[in-house]
């Protein structure tokens, strides 16, 4: 059977097209395979680089672990640019050389240094030692109490602003007038009148760092520990300046000195003397201020009350009727009241301090909850006052008075 010439030509052409298509398909497959291999090679290269980095890190860590520990020492004296006398932590003193990596200006008496185990050469200068207990006393987060949240203490707020806040915010005012701002302020008054609250408000209103110390924390068992902690607290305050140091319950460490020969009393007296020395060492126009609080001013040592230490002594007294009304307005601001005359409540709450009034508001709310009401009425406050007054009569407190006042 014979085919036309055109048909034969078409068959040949189709064969060539099919062959060309197969070749292109093979080329495309090969190119795709090459691309996949290149991508895989890149991934392997990246993994290789990452492994090399991890290997280098592990090698460095291993080298660190192989390095022998250094000996700690304290500089006693610098003989010349490259030699110094060091007291090692093991006991004896040594005349040692300085490493070329150590700046001779950093070698001062009292500096902490690291010594090589074999040659005892100084290889590193350490930062000044800080007591972890003093570092823990710094408050990182500001309290959420402002002066607007304190009622009945307008005169006291004005006085503490003049002593603490104004010198920190506007020191030029004192220089223009030509007077030295007070170094510190002592707050005294019955428990619950708002002494600690005022200190919190000062921390909130100023941008200064705030270091809070409780007097009993400064009383330590072993000789010199309390004095060292006092030094570290004041050193921390200077480094963090502008700073406010608040010493709560200062009577625990600043009580009158006696002739007692017991070891505990002598250690408290040493701590007090260190506190007096640190307060005298302050620059009055410096950015460090001291606030102290106590409810026993009668037992404080006269030395700490003299002008130049606590220049201004502020009494946080019992609030009067208007003061109690201001406090009640603050505490009842978010309370659901119906038919309550706060002026009448303030009259009924005679001889109550701010903490008592806050307790009255809380108790009034509890009485409303007990009766399954969503609002508080006048009878709730009357019952709350009777309840709180009964508690106060069981544990009454007579506020001692200062016989001599300074500032």
UniProtKB/Swiss-Prot annotation:
Region (Docks into pockets in the proteasome alpha-ring to cause gate opening) location: 405-407
Described purpose of this protein according to its UniProt entry: ATPase which is responsible for recognizing, binding, unfolding and translocation of substrate proteins into the archaeal 20S proteasome core particle. Is essential for opening the gate of the 20S proteasome via an interaction with its C-terminus, thereby allowing substrate entry and access to the site of proteolysis. Thus, the C-termini of the proteasomal ATPase function like a 'key in a lock' to induce gate opening and therefore regulate proteolysis.
Coiled-coil segments: 22-67
UniProt free text on domains: Consists of three main regions, an N-terminal coiled-coil domain that may assist in substrate recognition, an interdomain involved in PAN hexamerization, and a C-terminal ATPase domain of the AAA type.
GO biological process: proteasomal protein catabolic process; protein unfolding
Keywords: ATP-binding, Chaperone, Coiled coil, Cytoplasm, Nucleotide-binding, Proteasome
InterPro entries to which the protein is assigned, alphabetical: 26S_Proteasome_ATPase (IPR050221), AAA+_ATPase (IPR003593), AAA_lid_3 (IPR041569), ATPase_AAA_core (IPR003959), ATPase_AAA_CS (IPR003960), NA-bd_OB-fold (IPR012340), Nucleotidase_PAN (IPR023501), P-loop_NTPase (IPR027417)
Binding site for ATP: 192-197, 331
Cellular component GO terms, alphabetical: cytoplasm; proteasome-activating nucleotidase complex
NCBIfam families given in the database record: PRK03992.1 (NF003069), proteasome-activating nucleotidase (TIGR01242)
UniProt record similarity statement: Belongs to the AAA ATPase family.
Protein location: Cytoplasm
Keyword Cytoplasm assigned: yes
Pfam families: AAA, AAA_lid_3, Prot_ATP_ID_OB_C
Subunit note: Homohexamer. The hexameric complex has a two-ring architecture resembling a top hat that caps the 20S proteasome core at one or both ends. Upon ATP-binding, the C-terminus of PAN interacts with the alpha-rings of the proteasome core by binding to the intersubunit pockets.
One of the record's GO molecular function terms: ATP hydrolysis activity
UniProt name for this protein: Proteasome-activating nucleotidase
């Amino acid at each position: 059977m014979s085919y036309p010439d055109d048909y034969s030509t078409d068959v040949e052409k189709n064969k060539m097209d099919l062959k060309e298509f197969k070749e292109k398909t093979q080329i495309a497959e090969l190119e795709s395979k090459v691309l996949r291999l290149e991508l895989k090679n890149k991934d392997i290269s990246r993994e290789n680089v990452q492994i090399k980095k991890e290997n280098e890190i592990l090698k460095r860590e291993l080298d660190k672990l192989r390095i022998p520990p250094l000996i700690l020492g304290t500089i006693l004296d610098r003989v010349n640019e490259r030699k110094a006398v060091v007291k090692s932590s093991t006991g004896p003193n040594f005349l040692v050389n300085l490493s070329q990596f150590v700046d001779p200006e950093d070698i001062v008496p009292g500096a902490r240094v690291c010594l090589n185990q074999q040659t005892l050469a100084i290889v590193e200068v350490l930062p000044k030692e800080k007591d972890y207990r003093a570092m823990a006393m710094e408050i990182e987060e500001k309290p959420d109490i402002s002066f607007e949240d304190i009622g009945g203490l307008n005169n006291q707020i004005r006085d503490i602003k003049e002593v603490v806040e104004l010198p920190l915010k506007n020191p030029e005012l004192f220089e223009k007038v030509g007077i030295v701002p007070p170094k510190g302020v002592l707050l005294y008054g019955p428990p619950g009148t708002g002494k600690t609250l005022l200190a919190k408000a000062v921390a909130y209103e100023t941008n200064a760092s705030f270091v809070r110390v409780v007097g009993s924390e400064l009383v330590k068992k072993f000789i010199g520990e309390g004095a060292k902690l006092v030094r570290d607290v004041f050193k921390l305050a200077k480094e963090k300046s502008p700073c406010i140091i608040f010493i709560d319950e200062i009577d625990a460490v600043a009580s009158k000195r006696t002739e007692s020969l017991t070891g505990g009393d002598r250690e408290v007296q040493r701590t007090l003397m260190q506190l007096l020395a640190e307060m005298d060492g302050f620059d009055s126009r410096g950015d460090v201020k001291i606030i102290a609080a106590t409810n026993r001013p009668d037992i404080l040592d006269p030395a700490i009350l003299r002008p130049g230490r606590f220049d201004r002594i502020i009494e946080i007294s019992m609030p009067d009727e208007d003061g109690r009304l201001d406090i009640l307005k603050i505490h009842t601001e978010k309370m659901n009241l119906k038919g309550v005359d706060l002026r009448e409540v303030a009259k009924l709450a005679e001889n109550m301090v701010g903490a008592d009034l806050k307790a009255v508001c809380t108790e009034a709310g509890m009485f409303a909850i007990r009766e399954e009401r969503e609002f508080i009425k006048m009878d709730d406050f009357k019952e709350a006052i009777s309840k709180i007054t009964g508690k106060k009569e069981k544990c009454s407190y007579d506020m001692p008075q200062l016989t001599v006042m300074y500032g």
